[in-house]
Regions:
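Short acidic, gly/pro-rich beta-turn/loop elements at beta-sheet edges
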Residues: 4, 16, 79, 137, ...
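Generic "edge-of-domain/loop-turn" microfeature
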Residues: 13, 66, 76-78, 134-136, ...
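Peripheral (often C-terminal) accessory segments that flank ATP-dependent C-N-forming ligase machineries
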Residues: 98-247
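Active-site "cap" helix and flanking loop/linker of ATP-utilizing ligase/carboxylase catalytic domains
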Residues: 35-57, 72-139
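Internal nucleotide-binding/catalytic subdomain
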Residues: 1-69, 73-76
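Short, intrinsically disordered/low-complexity patches at protein termini
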Residues: 27-29, 91-93, 211-214
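Short, charged/polar low-complexity linear motifs in solvent-exposed/disordered segments
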Residues: 20-24, 84-88, 99, 206-209
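Generic structural signal for well-ordered, non-membrane alpha-helical segments
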Residues: 30-37, 92, 171, 185-188
Length: 247
């Protein structure tokens, strides 16, 4: 088995929902998470007798250790918008190109490293766009601001003029995602902060006049998010330097 990327889902509270996707962060192959997850996933593949082709698995870290959520006999999803970033981080290859090499050029495939490089060749991550408002979109000035960011690689969205936007509470109400990558990690973080502030300021869209554009109560006082959470506060079951997992 070869591991071409390992990700941590960034899930947080927003708009009264306890688990909203804010993005995916690649993690170093020498990180504490990767040292647990990579051998675990390879053990799952062996147990399932999967020897050929790409796979995409999801693991939840619990107080009892890693727990398998799913194992798919396919490449990582997202319409492949992550491929340019992974190639940049890995130095020229991705799960897609590795799969092609496995079938078309075995010599090249076997020459690929056992797992992704440490450290990465650049900094990168996927930012899922979160809506704190609702209404009918008139224009999307925030898209051009995002496209001009130094670390911008790709914007994927189906939200445009005429679209109905609602509060983001799950993957289906996300307004899009942005792939960011830059050789300077501080630049990427600066751009990410800019996007998050645009979300909170409702600066990505201009809404139609005459439509009651409603703002999420969380944007008025982000510290009060817990007051709108559904059910009991989640309990931390695993914490590392990069991620906290709740149950």
């Amino acid at each position: 088995h070869k591991t071409t990327m390992c990700w941590v889902y960034d899930k947080r509270q927003a708009n009264g929902s306890a688990f909203v996707y804010f993005g995916l962060q690649p993690i170093d192959s020498e990180s504490e998470e990767a040292k647990i997850v990579i051998p675990y996933i390879r053990g799952v593949l062996d147990a399932m007798e999967i020897k050929h082709g790409p796979t995409h698995g999801e693991v939840m870290m619990t107080s009892d250790g890693p727990c398998l959520v799913e194992m798919n006999c396919r490449a990582h999803g997202g319409d492949g918008n992550w491929v340019p970033m992974v190639r940049g981080l890995n130095g020229g290859y991705s799960q897609v190109s590795a799969t092609i090499d496995a079938y078309m050029d075995p010599t090249r495939f076997h020459a690929l490293p056992d797992k992704m490089p440490s450290p990465f060749k650049a900094a990168g991550q996927e930012c899922c766009l979160v809506s704190y408002s609702k209404g009918t979109v008139k224009s999307t000035p925030g898209y051009e601001v995002i496209r001009r960011l130094p670390s911008f690689v790709y914007l994927e969205t189906r939200t445009g003029p005429g679209s109905e936007v609602d509060y983001t509470v799950d993957p289906f109400t996300s307004i899009g995602s942005v792939i960011l990558m830059h050789e300077d990690k501080s630049q990427l973080q600066e751009d990410l902060v800019r996007i998050r502030q645009m979300e909170k300021d409702n600066a990505i869209f201009v809404y139609e006049k005459g439509v009651d554009m409603m703002r999420s109560p969380s944007t008025g006082n982000l510290s009060s998010l817990s007051g709108f959470a559904i059910g009991d506060r989640p309990k931390t079951v695993f914490t590392s330097s990069r991620a906290s997992v709740y149950w």
